[in-house]
Amino acid sequence: PPMERFLYSADHRLKDYKTKNPLLIFRNDGGSARVAKTMAVKTYSSGPCGGMQGAKALAIHYGFNHLISYDVGGTTTDIGVITDGAINERRRGIIEGIDISFPMPNIYSAGVGGSSIITTDEHGICIGPQSVGAAPGPACFGYGGKDATITDVFLLLGVFDPARYFGGKLTLDAERALDVITTTIATPLALSTFDAL
């Protein structure tokens, strides 16, 4: 019911603004439907499914028949496979360990994303489940973040171009990332920053 109320409220709000097109809800089967035709079970994991649809479009564009998609979001990482140009799926999907009667993309989601906080303990390096969120965000964003995150590590490893992050609208600060990795990870574990990465 809360989701239904939210979607209908959004749909009515758009109608109040006289939008020409109806609100369409993306589903985990790769399609979309109006609010009245959408079942909650079809929206479960629809975001990662959308990522797989995007990966499939890129695979087709570049002529790849087989592809592994690795989608790192703020709080999760979603991994899926495209084989012979099709997204791998389960004939009967699984939601929270329960079989359902609908097919679903076979996507593995891990609770570790770009905003996941990296800490240390007596066993070594720990990642998550805590997250810095969008505010203050990773240290390299320059908005006051003081915790090391996956995004800070990716920047220092060269995965991200600091000048082109977020379409060039956000310049990443490698010095801040280096400082937070050194002080919160490398120094407590008596490692070089290189080894901590």
Residues of each region from the PLM?
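N-terminally biased helix-coil "hinge/interface" segments that flank
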Residues: 1-197
